[in-house]
Amino acid sequence: MDGLTAPIAADVAYKQLLQRQSTTRPQGDAPLPLTPPPFDAASQLINVTGAHAFTAPGSGDARGECPGLNALANHNYLPHNGIATINQFVSATTQVFGMGADLALFLSTYGAVIDGSGTSWSIAGGPHIGIGGSHGNYESDSSPLKSDLYQYGSNSKLILEQFHELYDMQPNAATANYNLDVLRTFRNQRFQESIDKNPLFVYGPFTGMAVSQAAFTFIYRFMANHSAEYPEGVLNKDVLKSFMSISGPENNLVWTPGHERIPSNWYRRNTADAYTIPYFETDILYFTSSNPQLNLVGCNEGKVDTYQNIDASTLSNGAYTAAQAAANPICFATEFALAELPGLTGLSLTSGVLGSLTSVLSSVTKNLGCKAIGSVNTTALALCPGFSLYGGPTAPVAPGAIQS
């Protein structure tokens, strides 16, 4: 172990989280806590009645790429128009999903500062308004269920063929559980599909190594239903369909855009087992253990199946080797994002609203014991014709794109 990864590995809680990777639980071969988390029905049941009853979005309400955020707005845990402040995002995601406060503050602040007004942002929207226009700096290719921007001309369309790929991995409704083991397999399939079908596929330092992994891990970690029998959570077919706005029988599934719903009698993860940044890091490492390529930045070069890796040392001007980035992907991704901010925004790290994001990112890297990246070499990304910092929610379909 080198000095770069020693600080985080020395953390007792992080060590305990890593131990779960070698354990199996009743639901199957998936990484789960060594000791089942507590279950408290009264505190974990999420209210979906009264003020929090499902209300379909109206014509002026924003609904975008993230099914969880759409569901929060549909149940009025976020403002129903889909535009919320940093504090509102933090409150809703921690209260309803059991997201760790550190992760919630990180994601909410980044979204508001880079893709919003500085203090608020939209769960849809275009560039500098919300997540819909964040392709290249936040939203990314190889989503679990949503379309690659340059493959389909949209980054917010749910592709039913992709949903079927995941849904059909658990054929028996009585025992179905879309846990992390299932999602790891699906993650690998989707990564390869973007290589095979999206000529402008980009897997970036922050958008790929961190954000795109979250799109998969969050499905199980935040959508599973918890119980006394299964305190770790089970994500069955009906709950998955509800959160993804899918209805109908298995031979005729239908997607209704923006109608994501929290199911009745749904119990979130216990906040004593909050999904923190170190917790998320161990899930990334579980994913990459089966596919080391997920640890490497890369892209297609304008045609399908032309994927090339880009060396972490080149991108970080020697601050991280490829092995160091792979050992601690959150450190590399966050430090890269931090070093990239001046070029991304045209502002200094201490100026105005950017100072608040700098403070949040610096807190993350300090707690993880990360080595700083003094400057980034974004010219290395010139290899990637699909690379941009602000794109979406629509774009021309790339020549040669293959649609499922």
Question: What do the predicted segments below correspond to?
Answer:
Residues 1-63, 67-68, 78-404:
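Polar/charged low-complexity regulatory segments
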